[in-house]
UniProtKB/Swiss-Prot annotation:
The keyword Membrane applies. It is found in: Membrane. One of its GO terms (cellular component) is membrane. This is Uncharacterized protein C1002.20. It comes from the Eukaryota. Keywords: Membrane, Transmembrane, Transmembrane helix. Its main location: membrane. The chain crosses the membrane at residues 72-94. It comes from Schizosaccharomyces pombe (strain 972 / ATCC 24843) (Fission yeast). It is a single-pass membrane protein.
Length: 101
């Protein structure tokens, strides 16, 4: 999947996301948005690697927000990388809070 195709297929909003070097598994809590089961990663290095990764998620509805707990298994080529997360789905993202541990 190319970036151009991702825009046509329902790109809503861009999140800047940083993987810390020592973490192979990064857990994101209380991400206030609704998407499909996939997140598109655009790798911002000369390697120009892209990935469309499926995530494990727990969905809880609170008022008009949908919170998903995302556990993103980070492939090796994303280590030490600043990447962008493109979220797909019928709803616009309403906010985000990232906790790393």
């Amino acid at each position: 999947m190319t970036f151009q195709r991702s825009l046509r297929d329902g790109f809503h909003r861009l999140i800047n996301f940083y993987f810390y070097p020592s973490y192979h598994d990064t857990v994101v809590h209380n991400l206030a948005f609704s998407t499909s089961d996939y997140i598109y990663f655009k790798h911002l290095t000369d390697r120009n690697d892209d990935a469309l990764l499926k995530v494990d998620q727990t969905i809880n509805k609170t008022n008009r927000f949908i919170f998903r707990k995302l556990k993103i298994l980070c492939p090796s080529f994303l280590n030490y990388s600043f990447i962008n997360i493109y979220c797909f789905g019928p709803y616009t993202m309403v906010g985000e809070e990232f906790l790393f541990f």
